[in-house]
């Protein structure tokens, strides 16, 4: 039976390079913007998944987790490796793929009563793993003082054999898609190497 350490399966700040560092805690925009609701069940499920950093539901236990900060652009990236049933993963990938059509644009209301105009688009991912889906979600609103706000979230899910990678990457400033793609590419390579080697790490 193959066993691997969480470190072996995960990615690190070094994989993404400067300015990424280990996280200093949850960003304030998570509660201020992502804790929101809307009428459509599919769109509400998306908001809930983004808020919880959980694309696959509470039953999905993460074997490896990396949480990283980009202090320069005030962005955060969360990378998870999960052991899930392939059919369940494919159903979630199909749901994610449908969202640019079913939730392309919609309005959400935060816990503080602020209105967010949400846009969901498909995002390109590396041709890595057995199946994959990426999204870019943009939430536009205003501060209580009337200043415009924009929260951008990249979402990526990739099935790699019996493993699944989930990445969320967001912030109120620039959110570079290259970092999302690098996390996916590095993660798939790492899992593939571990599976090929079949070695046990303790």
Predicted regions and their residues:
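Sec/Tat-exported extracytoplasmic proteins
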Residues: 14-20, 24, 96, 100-107, ...
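Generic alpha-helical secondary structure signal
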Residues: 14, 41, 87-90, 178, ...
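Short C-terminal domain-edge/linker segments immediately following a structured domain
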Residues: 53, 109-115, 166-171, 187-190, ...
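A short, solvent-exposed beta-edge/loop patch
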Residues: 118-190
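Extracytoplasmic/periplasmic, Sec-exported soluble proteins
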Residues: 8, 71, 81-84, 175-179
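N-terminal low-complexity, Pro/Thr-rich disordered segments
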Residues: 1-8, 38-41, 46-49, 195-202
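Short basic (Lys/Arg) and small-residue
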Residues: 11
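A small/polar (G/S/T-enriched), proline-flanked helix-loop surface module common
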Residues: 22-147
């Amino acid at each position: 039976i193959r066993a691997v350490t969480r470190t072996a399966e995960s990615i690190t700040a070094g994989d993404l390079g400067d300015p990424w560092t280990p996280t200093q805690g949850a960003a304030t925009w998570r509660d201020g913007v992502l804790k929101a609701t809307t009428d459509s069940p599919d769109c509400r499920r998306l908001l809930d998944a983004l808020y919880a950093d959980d694309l696959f539901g509470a039953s999905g236990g993460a074997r490896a987790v990396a949480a990283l900060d980009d202090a320069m652009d005030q962005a955060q990236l969360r990378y998870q490796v999960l052991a899930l049933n392939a059919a369940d993963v494919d159903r979630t990938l199909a749901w994610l793929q449908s969202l640019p059509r079913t939730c392309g644009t919609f309005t959400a209301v935060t816990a503080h009563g602020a209105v967010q105009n949400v846009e969901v688009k498909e995002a390109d991912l590396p041709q890595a793993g057995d199946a994959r889906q990426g999204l870019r979600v943009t939430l536009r609103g205003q501060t209580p003082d009337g200043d415009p706000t924009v929260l951008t979230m990249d979402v990526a899910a990739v099935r790699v054999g019996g493993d699944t990678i989930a990445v969320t990457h967001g912030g109120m400033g620039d959110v570079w898609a290259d970092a999302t793609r690098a996390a996916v590419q590095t993660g798939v390579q790492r899992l593939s190497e571990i599976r090929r080697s079949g070695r046990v790490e303790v």
